[in-house]
Amino acid sequence: ISELIESVSLEGYEHLRPHELSGGMQQRAALCQALIHEPKTLLLDEPLGKLDAMTRENIRKDLQNLWMNEKPTVLMVTHSIEEAVQMSSKVCVITPRPGLIDKIIEIKLPWPRDLEVKRSQEFADYMAEIQEVFQGYGVI
């Protein structure tokens, strides 16, 4: 358990109750709870949606490290195009109504997806491709 706590940067906070943790720490604790049984599949529904920008970026790094080290299958729902490109090997674009998979885009960027990768033309191209799909729906 101590390795898991360390992997999400919560060492020293093990004895606090959830309401005593910040929002980012609560998200990390929830991630730790989900990982304790070493799942082969991890389902994440907007795991970074309610976090401030700094905490969001730190947890993105934690999730990338987890994926690179443990290799679980991760299905993550997000409304952030940037987050989808940064965190995914494949992005499934879902239609507004009904919710059907319209397009699957394979993201062929190197791991880890650090600031250098995010500043690359390839990253921008993937974001533009996904934005064009949403523009076709009239939602952007």
Please provide the spans of the model-predicted regions.
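Conserved ABC ATPase "signature" region
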Residues: I1-Y13, N65
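Hydrophobic anchor residue at the start of the ABC signature
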Residues: L31
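Conserved H-loop
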Residues: K71-V77
